[in-house]
């Protein structure tokens, strides 16, 4: 009876070990914060700070950001620049605004002087070690000042 129980215990342990999810497949989206917005004559730069809560690094191939100022949607920013987030680390990333988004942001900031709440909804395309793509979504906020 003992060998039977031992073989059942070993089999169960192997099955449970084989069913565990690798750390990379249990990814949390990074925490994000808007740290700056600078706009001028049809140009602009949005600065975001990302904090990776995962025990594995994140390789973001590309990202899409939707910018809102106050309660107004300003526009969508597609960013093809890669972002490397070290495990449990932080990175500051700057995103160049398309001309239409920069113009809309500048018009909003001129009409609303002082500090304005900026909200950015980001979709981050992470490439896993197996070359799969996982979309991580996060929302960041911060106060920005009119020029």
Protein language model features and the residues they cover:
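Bacterial Sec signal peptide processing site at the extreme N-terminus
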Residues: 15-36
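Post-signal-peptide N-terminal segment of Sec-exported extracytoplasmic proteins
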Residues: 35-76, 126-136
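Hydrophobic residues positioned within well-ordered beta-strands of beta-sheet architectures
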Residues: 44-46, 63-65, 93-95, 116-122
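Intrinsically disordered, low-complexity Pro/Gly/Ser/Thr-rich segments with frequent PxxP/GP/PP motifs
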Residues: 69-105
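Terminal connector regions
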Residues: 101-147
């Amino acid at each position: 009876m003992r060998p039977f129980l031992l073989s059942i215990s070993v089999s169960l342990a192997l099955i449970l070990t084989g069913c565990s999810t690798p750390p990379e497949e249990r990814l949390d989206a990074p925490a994000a914060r808007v740290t700056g917005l600078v706009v001028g004559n049809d140009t602009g730069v949005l600065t975001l700070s990302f904090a990776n809560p995962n025990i594995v690094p994140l390789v973001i191939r590309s990202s899409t950001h939707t910018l809102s100022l106050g309660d107004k949607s300003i526009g969508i920013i597609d960013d093809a620049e890669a972002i490397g987030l070290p495990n449990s680390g932080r990175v500051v990333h700057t995103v160049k605004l398309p001309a239409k988004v920069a113009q809309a942001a500048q018009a909003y900031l001129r009409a609303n002087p002082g500090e304005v709440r900026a909200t950015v909804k980001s979709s981050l395309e992470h490439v896993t070690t197996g070359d799969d793509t996982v979309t991580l979504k996060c929302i960041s906020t911060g106060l920005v000042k009119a020029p």
